[in-house]
Every structure is written in C-alpha cells, then in structure tokens.
C-alpha cells in the first residue's frame, strides 16, 4: 500500500455541515479524490481538549452536538461511522511513554463530523479521535505527533481539524474581507508551510500581534501541527480552501503527501 497523506482541514462554522454545495465542502470532496481510500481515520479536533491525552475507543461512537444557538436541523445531523478499538490501542502504544486514556463513551464532536460528512459521506470508514492536552506547549504537540508516523504506512489518514485563524470575538457577520492581521498571519503560516519552516509553525507566537489576534487560544491552531509534524522532505504539499470567513476565521486547509 502507498503511504497515506496527512490532512489539515479548516472546519469553520458548524453550519457548513448543512450546506453540501458551499465552496469549502466542494474543496473537501475534490481533495479526497487525490489519494486512496483510507482503512481508518485518526482525527485530532479543536473541540476535544483538556489536561490529559484521551482516545475514543468505543465501537459505535455517538454524536456530540457541542454548540448552541444554531438551527435544530444541525442537532439532527448523523454521522454513524464505526469506531476502532484496535486503532485506539495502536495510537496509545505509539504515543508511549505518554499516558493515553481509552474513553469508550466519548463520541464525535462537530470538529470531526461536520467535515467527515463531506470528506466521506458514506460514514463507513472507522474513525478514532485523539484529544489535545492544552497543558502542554506547541513544541510538545509537534513532537508527540511525530510518533504517529507509522500510521501513514498502515492506511490510516491522520486529519487535524481546526482553523489557522480563529477569533470569534472579532467575527463580522456581513460578507467582508479578512482583517489585515488575519491575512498577515494566514500568509505567514502559508509561507512557512511552503518552506517547510516548522520552527515558525511551532513558535507562531513570534509573529506577535498578528498571532495574538489570530490565535487567542491554541486549540484551533494545534491540530495543524499534528499534520505538519508528519511531513517528510519528499512530500508534496497543497493548500486549498484558502479563504477567510467572517473576517477572522480562516478556512485554510492543507494536504501533505
């Protein structure tokens, strides 16, 4: 089997789950045509974080509707993909000596199902989620992610789901171009991706004001590092869906491999 690529997806608003024809979801459908169907998916979502590492280990994860103030239809979306206790155990083994707790009760949050619904709408590929330990710095996450490299050889698609720029307080509801600071930060990250400049990607706070405004909290940025950490020197890289929504939410997505 050819080595699987790795993917980072900008998931944006949960409402994207309901609009199959918006340009971002069209981008997701286009990108998965570029590589083989995975045997399983490991998802690192911005919406599962805490002070420790956990992995979903149930055979039939339920849906988590972790939002409020949205139409009722959004809380009726189903993505009945199976879990994979086997993959969960493999992830725990690969990440040793870090302790990873198996969670058989945890379901899929919208950072996972809202994009998987458009990447693989049949919901027939096993999915496991790995949580983010926000007690640890970005370098720790990057180094941890490197341990997941063997998954690429085993047909597992590693997907980080977040947003490079994610500032909810600065959102503008009317159609508008991105803020200058959001554009600057997004462009700096894109340049670092093109140059394989992992130092800049990990130490994004060195971008100063643009970083402080674009990443007011780290959970939406960190999933990007789980993708870039698995990049090898010969891997191709494609940036897609490279737009800003509501002025301060970047939909920038990246395929590596």
What are these regions (language model features)?
Residues 1-98:
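A short aromatic-anchored loop/beta-hairpin motif
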Residues 5-9, 40-45, 130, 151-164, ...:
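Beta-strand elements within well-structured catalytic alpha/beta cores of enzymes
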Residues 7-8, 66-72, 121-128, 202-203:
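Short, basic/glycine-rich phosphate-binding loops at helix/coil junctions
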Residues 88-142:
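Internal, conserved structured core segments that host functional sites
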């Amino acid at each position: 089997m050819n080595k699987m690529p790795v993917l980072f997806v900008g998931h944006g608003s949960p409402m994207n789950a309901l609009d199959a024809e918006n340009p971002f979801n069209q981008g997701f459908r286009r990108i998965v045509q570029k590589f083989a169907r995975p045997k399983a998916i490991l998802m690192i979502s911005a919406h599962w974080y805490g002070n420790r590492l956990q992995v979903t280990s149930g055979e039939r994860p339920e849906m988590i509707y972790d939002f409020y103030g949205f139409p009722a239809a959004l809380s009726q979306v189903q993505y009945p993909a199976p879990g994979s206790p086997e993959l969960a155990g493999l992830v725990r083994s690969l990440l040793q000596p870090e302790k990873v707790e198996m969670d058989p009760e945890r379901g899929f949050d919208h950072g996972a199902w809202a994009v998987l619904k458009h990447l693989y709408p049949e919901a027939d590929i096993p999915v496991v989620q790995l949580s983010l330990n926000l007690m640890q710095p970005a370098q720790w996450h990057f180094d941890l992610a490197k341990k997941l490299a063997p998954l690429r050889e085993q047909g597992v698609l590693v997907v980080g789901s977040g947003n490079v720029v994610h500032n909810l307080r600065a959102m503008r509801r009317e159609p508008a171009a991105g803020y200058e600071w959001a554009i600057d930060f997004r462009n700096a990250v894109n340049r670092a991706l093109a140059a394989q400049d992992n130092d800049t990607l990990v130490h994004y706070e060195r971008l100063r004001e643009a970083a402080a405004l674009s990443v007011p909290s780290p959970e939406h940025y960190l999933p990007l590092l789980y993708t870039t950490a698995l990049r090898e020197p010969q891997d191709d890289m494609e940036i897609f869906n490279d737009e800003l929504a509501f002025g301060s939410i970047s939909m920038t997505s990246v395929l590596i491999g």
